[in-house]
From Swiss-Prot:
<feature type="region of interest" description="Framework-3">
    <location>
        <begin position="57"/>
        <end position="88"/>
    </location>
</feature>
<dbReference type="GO" id="GO:0002250">
    <property type="term" value="P:adaptive immune response"/>
</dbReference>
<dbReference type="GO" id="GO:0006955">
    <property type="term" value="P:immune response"/>
</dbReference>
<feature type="region of interest" description="Complementarity-determining-1">
    <location>
        <begin position="24"/>
        <end position="34"/>
    </location>
</feature>
<dbReference type="InterPro" id="IPR050150">
    <property type="entry name" value="IgV_Light_Chain"/>
</dbReference>
<dbReference type="InterPro" id="IPR007110">
    <property type="entry name" value="Ig-like_dom"/>
</dbReference>
<feature type="region of interest" description="Complementarity-determining-3">
    <location>
        <begin position="89"/>
        <end position="97"/>
    </location>
</feature>
<dbReference type="InterPro" id="IPR003599">
    <property type="entry name" value="Ig_sub"/>
</dbReference>
<protein>
    <recommendedName>
        <fullName>Ig kappa chain V-V region W3082</fullName>
    </recommendedName>
</protein>
<feature type="region of interest" description="Framework-2">
    <location>
        <begin position="35"/>
        <end position="49"/>
    </location>
</feature>
<feature type="region of interest" description="Complementarity-determining-2">
    <location>
        <begin position="50"/>
        <end position="56"/>
    </location>
</feature>
<keyword id="KW-1015">Disulfide bond</keyword>
<feature type="region of interest" description="Framework-4">
    <location>
        <begin position="98"/>
        <end position="108"/>
    </location>
</feature>
<keyword id="KW-1280">Immunoglobulin</keyword>
<feature type="region of interest" description="Framework-1">
    <location>
        <begin position="1"/>
        <end position="23"/>
    </location>
</feature>
<dbReference type="InterPro" id="IPR013783">
    <property type="entry name" value="Ig-like_fold"/>
</dbReference>
<keyword id="KW-1064">Adaptive immunity</keyword>
Amino acid sequence: DVQMIQSPSSLSASLGDIVTMTCQASQGTNINLNWFQQKPGKAPKLLIYGASILEDGVPSRFSGSRYGTDFTLTISSLEDEDMATYFCLQHTYLPYTFGGGTKLEIKR
C-alpha cells in the first residue's frame, strides 16, 4: 500500500500568517492527490484536487504544490475560519490512502 506521511500532526499559527503542511507518498509515481478540510461535526470539504487545482468556491489563499512524491498545502493570510483539520488523499493506487491529518489551531 502507498502510505501518505503527513506532517505536522498539529500546528498553531496567528491570524495573517502563512502556514504549510506536507504529505509524502511512500512510493509510486504520478500520484493524484486531493486536500480536504474538515471541521468538527462536518463532512470533509474538498479544497484542492490534482495536487494543485483549486476547487470552485475555495478562497485563493489556499494553494497546493508537488515535487515528485512530496505534496504541500499552503494557506496564506490565515483567517479564523481556517481553524480545522486538513488531510490529504491519494487516489491513484488501491487501496486509496489518507494522510494522518494536520490539526490547525489559531494562536490568540
